[in-house]
Amino acid sequence: IEDLHHCLKHYGKRIVDRLMDWGILGEKTLLGHCIYINGHEMDLIKETNTMVVHNPESNMGNACGCPPTMELVHRGILTGLGTDGYTHDMTESYKVANVLHKHHLCDPNAAWGEVPQMLFDGNVKIAERYFPQKLGVLKEGAAADVIVVDYDPLTPMNGGNANSHILFGMTGKQVVTTVANGKVLMKDRELVSCL
């Protein structure tokens, strides 16, 4: 919050207003955290087609607050899920984001749809703004980024409950094989190649 106070004291403007003045906002700009933004700033982010990445574990670990991430998603702002280096396990970020917003909003139904949307749709759309390959699908011509997870579900798994299985049953420690851009990098937990 110190950066917001600094901007208000020295420039009489909020952070996103200053970014707008400098021409920084736009479809190739990715804002991190956005913890203390208000409705006006969200409007600017939306109008400029700027993207946001939510880093729940970093925000919690630094005790700097909970951003209005659910509102960003509901306003149609392209929002992804990240780690800010706090962890490298996106399933953990998925879990933390899910419970953080339930707790913050005092609503056990919050974040069920928004967090998987950020992880599986938002992250793909954000990456596609920077990389020419088709991402997020398994089809000819796409980047073919795939992980294989050693997971034995205790209950039947299908398309309707896969997100719940990922949320409650899987962790990054269960990844046994990784394929990036069609190239096997790790097989049976052994590194076999570099990018």
Q: Could you say what each language-model-derived stretch is?
A:
Residues 1-51, 63-79:
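Histidine/acidic residue-rich metal-binding segments in metalloenzymes
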Residues 34-35, 102, 152, 183:
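Flexible loop residues that form catalytic
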Residues 56-61, 84-86:
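Short, acidic/turn-prone active-site loops that include or flank metal/cofactor-
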Residues 143-192:
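C-terminal cap of metal-dependent C-N hydrolases
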